[in-house]
Amino acid sequence: MAARRPGLIALFDVDGTLTAPRKVVTPEMLTFMQELRKVVTVGVVGGSDLIKISEQLGSTVTNDYDYVFSENGLVAHKEGKLIGTQSLKSFLGEEKLKEFINFTLHYIADLDIPIKRGTFIEFRSGMLNVSPIGRNCSQEERDEFEKYDKVHNIRPKMVSVLREKFAHLNLTFSIGGQISFDVFPQGWDKTYCLRYLDGFNEIHFFGDKTYKGGNDHEIYESERTVGHTVTSPDDTVKQCKSLFLEN
């Protein structure tokens, strides 16, 4: 068996990269990741919290990968152990947080879209996730909203309003997944996790939303990473085989 390549890590987005959006990882992908882990250090970085990442990648996720960065790395695990956390509440303060949440809920209340469900704002330790349709919609409703959003630009328009209204808070708005966007302080995008990877001189990042405004863009563009755009989990496997397993 080939020895692990020192100083190199392969870092993966979750949705659209290791799994279909919000779907559970396939057994084939899990097996492939374990094979890959024999030759390179492997990490995952997702915008979701650890509970959601575990639902997609499995309950043993923090042990299946060398590094697991949930909420863009604001909650960081290495070899199964928690190594760092950051809190939006302590960073912004309750008053500013409340001002933002109140305005956003008013905006959604006035929004004319075909359907609305529930959980329009999800508070995570390092970010807010905002969904105009509501996070507890069905998968079918998710798919429908995604199509509707592509035509009517519900999320981009909402982000534009919030960005202007709350310019003084220096927030980043990142559209990801099918139905929502993340809101967090500038610099708390996926590049945040790189502070834990100083021991690596070659960081390969794989993600699907690497375009400007996508939640993989900043880490993809970072001078510290070699960025790879993927179109699906199958494409991720194909690119990794070519890069790490066939030479």
From Swiss-Prot:
Class of enzymatic activity (EC top level): isomerase
Positions of alpha-D-mannose 1-phosphate binding: 22, 124, 135, 142, 180, 182
Residue positions of the active site: 13, 15
Cytoplasm is among the record's keywords: yes
Localization (cell): Cytoplasm
Binding site for Mg(2+) 1: 13, 15, 208
EC number: 5.4.2.8
Residue sites binding Mg(2+) 2 per the record: 220, 225
Signal peptide (from-to): none
Co-factor requirement: Mg(2+)
Pfam families: PMM
Any one annotated GO CC term: cytosol
GO BP term, example: mannose metabolic process
Recorded metabolic or biological pathway in which this protein acts: Nucleotide-sugar biosynthesis; GDP-alpha-D-mannose biosynthesis; alpha-D-mannose 1-phosphate from D-fructose 6-phosphate: step 2/2
Catalyzed reaction equations: alpha-D-mannose 1-phosphate = D-mannose 6-phosphate
InterPro entries per UniProt: HAD-like_sf (IPR036412), HAD-SF_hydro_IIB (IPR006379), HAD_sf (IPR023214), PMM (IPR005002), PMM_cap (IPR043169)
Keywords annotated in UniProt: Cytoplasm, Isomerase, Magnesium, Metal-binding
A GO MF term: phosphomannomutase activity
Record function comment: Catalyzes the interconversion of mannose-6-phosphate to mannose-1-phosphate, the precursor for the synthesis of GDP-mannose. GDP-mannose is an essential sugar nucleotide for the synthesis of D-mannose-containing cell wall polysaccharides (galactomannans and glucomannans), glycolipids, glycoproteins and the antioxidant L-ascorbate. Can complement the yeast temperature-sensitive mutant sec53-6.
Family classification: Belongs to the eukaryotic PMM family.
Quaternary structure, from the entry: Homodimer.
Name the record gives this protein: Phosphomannomutase
